[in-house]
Regions:
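Acidic, surface-exposed loops and disordered segments
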Residues: 1-144
């Protein structure tokens, strides 16, 4: 990961994967999720077919599925980073890394999983530099 100090010096490193295969109807994951709702099999089949049709129309390739599932991992990432901050633990979401190289090192089956984001956790050594952020009114528009 280009020897980024956040990665080389952190105490814990979380690698979040996008589960490409799990969202496909034939994986069985989708069916298990619908069956948890304790509905008749005909209804389960109906929803699986509806889902499969949606997937075929909108997420027709593994690349499209990766793009969507990688975005979904942001929900987990945000929750982890917020929980860490509440506990006083620093973190940094990193998307800038050599994806293929890291996937190879991890030995991922790319038909099932792809690397989405890396999050180092720990405590900073130096004081944090001041943040030069845009004023809120320059980046957010409230619509009434």
């Amino acid at each position: 990961c280009w020897n980024q100090p956040q990665i080389t010096t952190c105490s814990h490193l979380v690698v979040i994967l996008a589960a490409i295969d799990a969202v496909k109807p034939e994986s069985g994951v989708v069916e298990r999720k619908f069956k948890r709702r304790e509905m008749p099999q005909e209804k389960v089949d109906f929803y699986i077919n509806l889902y499969a049709s949606h997937l075929a129309n909108t997420l027709s390739s593994d690349e499209n599925i990766y793009s969507w599932t990688a975005k979904q991992t942001g929900i987990a990432m945000g929750n982890m980073m917020t929980a860490a901050a509440i506990k006083g633990v620093d973190s940094c979401a990193i998307e800038g890394f050599e994806k293929e190289k890291v996937e190879e090192i991890l030995g991922l089956d790319l038909t099932k999983y792809r690397l989405s984001v890396i999050i180092p956790f720990g405590y900073r050594i130096n004081e944090q530099s001041s943040q030069l952020r845009e004023p809120l009114e320059n980046v957010v528009e409230f619509i009434k």
